[in-house]
Amino acid sequence: MEFDVVVVGAGPAGSVAAWAAAEAGCDVLILERKAEIGVPKQCAEGISAHGLEHAGIEPQDEWIATEISRALIYAPNGKEFEVPGDGYVLERRVFDKWLVVRAVEAGAEVELLAHARRALLDEGRVVGVEYEGEDGVHEVRARIVIAADGIESRIGRTAGLVPSLKPVEMCTCAQYEMVGVDVEEDATHFFVDAEFFPGGYFWIFPKGEGRANVGLGIRGSESEPGDALKVLNRALEDHELISEAVADAVPVEVNVGGVPVCGPVERTYGDGILLVGDAARQVNPLTGGGLHTSLVCGRIAGEVAAEAIEEDDTSASFLKRYQDRWEEEFGKTFKYALKASKIFSEMSNEELNALAEALDREDILRLVKGEEVVKVAKKVISRKPSLLKYAKHLMK
């Protein structure tokens, strides 16, 4: 078999890449290791309205669980900040399939239960994929391979583009979908506590009628395998605000996984290959959110792949335009978020509470967006001189 483009992974990044490439006239094959696309879900399912708009995707009632108008952020001492912002909590099992259907309607083919083993190389150039299907091991040739195969990316590793993750470079995550959760359902809820959730935070994302995704991420360097679920259960019992919200709630689904928080890999392209989504570690290191970036970077990857096929040039020098384009969209955001993530992960509860006392909601919004950071840092220094060392790092 031979295709113009083989996409490994049918998550949002891979599906949008396949959709864009197929829409541009490429012969596209999607290889997906799961039996069912979108199952199990691997995230809290939230995305901003801007994120969908940026990706060129119109909201559809069939995959929107609830609409969001704000975020509520809680400091360790319980102080609450309201940050306005429109968004959605999705039904990812519906959304992910919807994206694949768009790719198929554009002409892409899909093979499920296809476990990618390695990239096929010819003198350093990626020329296809070896995968294990239901009836044995196969090789499929491609002019371009788009690796969207997740955080461990076998394709990216065998192509020499994806290094191993260190514990400090990832967060381990655990989440329940629960029914009977008592929170305001027009808001997403974020709880920061260095003692409960070291190097991370806790979230409640409402899905309507008392349903919600309730979970956390904690820094891998601050935990052992399996700790995330233990910490989640402890928070449900012992954290004052969280335990109150879930007092009558019952879990109906559990999900565990990992999120890279180290910023993107150095090179997301090579001869005959592009990396997208978690495979490229295109995840915001501060929030751990990757859906918005995956959708936009996936579309860029599909478009650049189609341009390369059209120009008959799949060299790294041509495909570099993919990285140039996504860096133009997200480069500054990733750089700031990585710096801010490192700072916040080092702060104690006493320091986090002091920061909360120094800031108002507009300041919090600026910090989250990475806007007017120097102005906010100067305000922190004037109000809480004890936080000077952190504020100075933000100003660099």
Curated annotation (Swiss-Prot):
Q: Name one GO biological process term.
A: membrane lipid biosynthetic process
How the cofactor is bound: the record states: Binds 1 FAD per subunit.
Q: What class of enzyme is it?
A: oxidoreductase
Q: Which GO terms describe its cellular component?
A: membrane
The pathway entry for this protein reads as: Membrane lipid metabolism; glycerophospholipid metabolism
Work out whether the entry's keyword set contains Zinc.
no
Q: Which Pfam families match?
A: FAD_oxidored, GGR_cat
Which GO terms label this protein's molecular function in UniProt? flavin adenine dinucleotide binding; geranylgeranyl reductase activity; oxidoreductase activity, acting on the CH-CH group of donors, NAD or NADP as acceptor
Its recorded reaction(s) are: a 2,3-bis-O-phytanyl-sn-glycerol 1-phospholipid + 8 A = a 2,3-bis-O-(geranylgeranyl)-sn-glycerol 1-phospholipid + 8 AH2; 2,3-bis-O-(phytanyl)-sn-glycerol 1-phosphate + 8 A = 2,3-bis-O-(geranylgeranyl)-sn-glycerol 1-phosphate + 8 AH2; CDP-2,3-bis-O-(geranylgeranyl)-sn-glycerol + 8 AH2 = CDP-2,3-bis-O-(phytanyl)-sn-glycerol + 8 A; archaetidylserine + 8 AH2 = 2,3-bis-O-phytanyl-sn-glycero-3-phospho-L-serine + 8 A
Record family assignment: Belongs to the geranylgeranyl reductase family. DGGGPL reductase subfamily.
Further comment found in the protein's record:
Reduction reaction proceeds via syn addition of hydrogen for double bonds.
Recorded protein name is: Digeranylgeranylglycerophospholipid reductase 2
Organism field: Methanopyrus kandleri (strain AV19 / DSM 6324 / JCM 9639 / NBRC 100938)
